[in-house]
Amino acid sequence: MNAINISNLKKSYDGKTNAINNISLNIPKGEIFGFLGPNGSGKTTTVRILNGILSSTSGHAEILGKTVGENNLELHRVCGVMTESSSCYENLTAEGNLIFFGRMHGMEEKLLRQRIDFILKRLELLDVRNKKVEAFSTGMRKRVSLAIALIHNPQILFLDEPTSGLDPENALNVLKLIKELAEENEVTIFLCTHQLKYAEDICTLYGFINNGKVLGFGTFDELAAKKNVSLQLKIRGENISEKFGLIHEGNNLYSKSISGDAEVNAIIHNIVANGGKVYEVVQQKLSLEQLYFMYIKGTASGVTL
């Protein structure tokens, strides 16, 4: 079963212009999905529909097999949400916020206390659990907001610009925590951001959206293959046969166009199995930013498609 299924989803606020236009996505369980696009592209509208905050104009969406819009209370039990504007109750402590939201989710008191201890420790907030949020830095408030989204142990986590307002170090720390928590608890993450560098660090699956339309969907390698992007494998070694399709560039350097990561292991294995020596391997590939602009603008690094 996929975690999220979206079919021909459309939303118009004025009956004329579509904020999102026939979006279709199928996201398997356990993926960290990066929904990437510029401001106003339709990312937040999509998340709000999936969370039941907005109704769609047409189309269908399911979360863990449950139809979005039919029983939003049930969906809220399995989903956690952290948006760009997520805020805590400043007059409450970090722990007080978690108690409040945990009880809202109907958590049993003993389980709630255990969960609070776990999350505060995991997010490095134990030392400030009894301090009011009003005294916290932006980075600490983001961690409290993430803790609130995770308090009821959701199976799906929606994150809309979770690093907004953070300096690079704090942004990286928050995303590292998100990735670790997702892997530890097998949580499916739906991450909306225009911070491509951060998305590249943690995402396993991508969707590119612009002007309400999904322009590309898949893993990095799948998206690159659809644009006929050829990755280059560079190998420095000795006694390497050219029968494996490698071009000898001189000075013990060899190269080969490859389709993705899966091909690299087989090439290295065959070289070594046939008596070759491998000293260094480098895979030269596009950055996520370059690939993104191939879909959004049709160019990357000055190369016109």
Question: Model-found features: residue ranges?
Answer:
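Conserved catalytic motifs of ABC-family nucleotide-binding domains
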Residues: 153
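Catalytic Walker B motif of ABC-type/P-loop ATPase nucleotide-binding domains
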Residues: 157-161
